[in-house]
Amino acid sequence: MPRKAKVVKDLKHFPKYATRQKNRCPICGRPRGFLRRFNMCRLCFREMALSGEITGVRKSSW
């Protein structure tokens, strides 16, 4: 029984929306439009890509 009580106690410390906390842009804190590959939101990605701060990223044109 003590082990079960410890597990229940540990579960109370987890945030309710853990995924939303994890997938936030570290630059602006935006929770939506998150790009996992670059670990930032789409707006910060666009600004940094256009200014040339992200290597290997170019604006596409055809």
UniProtKB/Swiss-Prot annotation:
Zn(2+) binds at C25, C28, C41, C44. It holds the Pfam family Ribosomal_S14. It comes from the Bacteria. Its cofactor is Zn(2+). GO terms for cellular component: cytoplasm; small ribosomal subunit. The keyword Signal does not apply. One of its GO terms (molecular function) is zinc ion binding. GO terms for biological process: translation. Binds 1 zinc ion per subunit. Keywords: Metal-binding, Ribonucleoprotein, Ribosomal protein, RNA-binding, rRNA-binding, Zinc. HAMAP family: Ribosomal_uS14_2_B (MF_01364_B). Binds 16S rRNA, required for the assembly of 30S particles and may also be responsible for determining the conformation of the 16S rRNA at the A site. Belongs to the universal ribosomal protein uS14 family. Zinc-binding uS14 subfamily. Part of the 30S ribosomal subunit. Contacts proteins S3 and S10. NCBIfam families: PRK08061.1 (NF005974). This is Small ribosomal subunit protein uS14. It comes from Hydrogenobaculum sp. (strain Y04AAS1). The lineage of its organism: Bacteria, Pseudomonadati, Aquificota, Aquificia, Aquificales.
